[in-house]
Every structure is written in structure tokens, then in C-alpha cells.
């Protein structure tokens, strides 16, 4: 299996979902966090105020170091200070857009925090910071739309709208991106399961990193990608649909439509665009696009 195939399967597919994935406290038989980390009220381990502040269950001095902790401080990359991403998507809007992510019925309750998202994004200074305000908002909506589809916890009898249930399930982002991020993800894949900062950071790495012949999702949504002759012949035109093709084209694209997966991704995207006050752009689906990685005679290249 190639680097790309491994990254594809490990970074954006929910490989398994647990009924309860909490790590510590009363949610996990009063277990303590490793390395002296704080145990949050929701049963997750970390070092920031989300974990060591109100409701902390044990080891609340946060004595462990840990890899980023999922919280608010730091983050390299120079993506700007508090006036960066938080100007476009303040915490109140994040909470409203992902309003059920902390519902007790969600396996990932309490895991995906706003501070973890903002801190991880600062590691990628071009994310949500390219182009005018409409484009910046469109990229955030596209990222949250695609990742919400991968972590969706909605079911037909659930309260609220289908597109209110993003970031409900865990999404296990292992992979060779650890080499780029200097994280031992192959040896310690549980880092993604236990640290929301790392979970967001690996997803953003996937979003920002091209994997030939695929462009990066960032390049597509910021209109800096120009289709090659092969792309044009395959019907791959700029727009949100190409991002779906990048992520899961072999299953969801080039088969006509509609299909539930495409429509779900588009539904999340439109909902978040509306919340952020931006336009959708064109070419939202990939129904008429051949997947990347198809070679001569229409046979799928061996990855």
C-alpha cells in the first residue's frame, strides 16, 4: 500500500467507533490519566483549562507535559494571534455550528474543543487565512463540512437537524503524517484518540498537504489549484466536489448520483457556509468526476 493509500484510509475514515471512548475518571472506572495529566469532567486527559479547570476529576495540577494537550496556548507556525481564526469563527459560533458534539449520547462527548481547533490551526498559517473573507470562511466551512461527515452522530430520531450532529463520533487519524508532524503516530496511535489537539492537527495536515496526483484540499477551496489536462478529461473541475474526490473518490465519485455520502457532505458544507455568511461556490458534488488514481483503460492504479 502506498503512502497515499495509507494516509487516505488512516486520516479521514472512521475505522471504528466505540460506544464509550473516555479515558479517565468516573467514565472509565476512575482511571487516572498517564503522566499526571488532568482528567476533564467528560473523562478525557489533557493539560489545559479544558481539562484542569472546572469539573476536573483528578490530577488537576496538570503535572504531565504531554504533546500539546488539546488546549488554548501556543501552537507554532505563526498563523497570527487571537485575531486570526477566532475573528471569523469565535467560540460561540463554533459551539452553535457543532451544537451536539457534547451531547451525552455522543461517544466523543467533550473531546473536540474550540481551543484545540484554534491551537491546531495555528500550526498551519495559511488555513482559513488565504484570500478575502468569503474565501477564508468558505475554507473553514469546507473543512468542518468534510470532517463533520466523517464524525457524524445523527440518527433519524435524533433531536435537531441532521447537520447539527457533526463531531459526535471519534475519527481515528493515524498515519504517516506523523513523520511530518514529528509525532509517533504509528507507534502510539492512541495519541489521536486521547489528544484533541493532535486529532485536529492530523486532520489539518491532510487538508493542507498535496499527495500527487491529488492537490491539497486547501488548494482546491482557495482556488489556487488549476486542473491538468488529465483532470479536465476526467471531469475534475474546481469546487467542493473535488475535495470529496480527494478524500473518498474511489467510493463516492464517478458513479452518477445522487448518493447519500455526497449529499451529506454537501449538506454540512452548506449549513456551515450559511452560518459563516459565505457563498458555496460551484461544482459541489463529484458525481461526474472520475476518481483520482485511475490509469489506462479506466483501471484503478495499484496504490
Curated annotation (Swiss-Prot):
| The protein's name in its UniProt record | Acidic endochitinase WIN6.2B
- Catalysed reaction equations from the record: Random endo-hydrolysis of N-acetyl-beta-D-glucosaminide (1->4)-beta-linkages in chitin and chitodextrins
Q: What class of enzyme is it?
A: hydrolase
Q: Which GO terms describe its molecular function?
A: chitin binding; chitinase activity; endochitinase activity
Spans annotated as Chitinase: 82-303
EC numbers: 3.2.1.14
Active-site residues, as the UniProt record annotates them: 150 (proton donor)
Its induction, per UniProt?
Answer: By wounding.
Q: Origin organism of this chain?
A: Populus trichocarpa
Q: Which PROSITE patterns match?
A: CHIT_BIND_I_1, CHIT_BIND_I_2, CHITINASE_19_1, CHITINASE_19_2
Pfam (any one): Chitin_bind_1
Question: What are the protein's UniProt keywords?
Answer: Carbohydrate metabolism, Chitin degradation, Chitin-binding, Disulfide bond, Glycosidase, Hydrolase, Plant defense, Polysaccharide degradation, Signal
Q: Which SUPFAM superfamilies does this one have?
A: Lysozyme-like, Plant lectins/antimicrobial peptides
Q: Where is the Chitin-binding type-1 domain?
A: 22-62
Under the heading InterPro entries, the entry gives:
Chitin-bd_1, Chitin-binding_1_CS, Endochitinase-like_sf, Glyco_hydro_19, Glyco_hydro_19_cat, Lysozyme-like_dom_sf
Q: What does this protein do?
A: Defense against chitin-containing fungal pathogens.
Which stretch is the leader sequence?
Answer: 1-21
Q: Which family does it belong to?
A: Belongs to the glycosyl hydrolase 19 family. Chitinase class I subfamily.
- GO annotation terms (biological process): cell wall macromolecule catabolic process; chitin catabolic process; defense response to fungus; polysaccharide catabolic process
Disulphide bonds annotated for this chain are 24-39, 33-45, 38-52, 56-60, 253-286
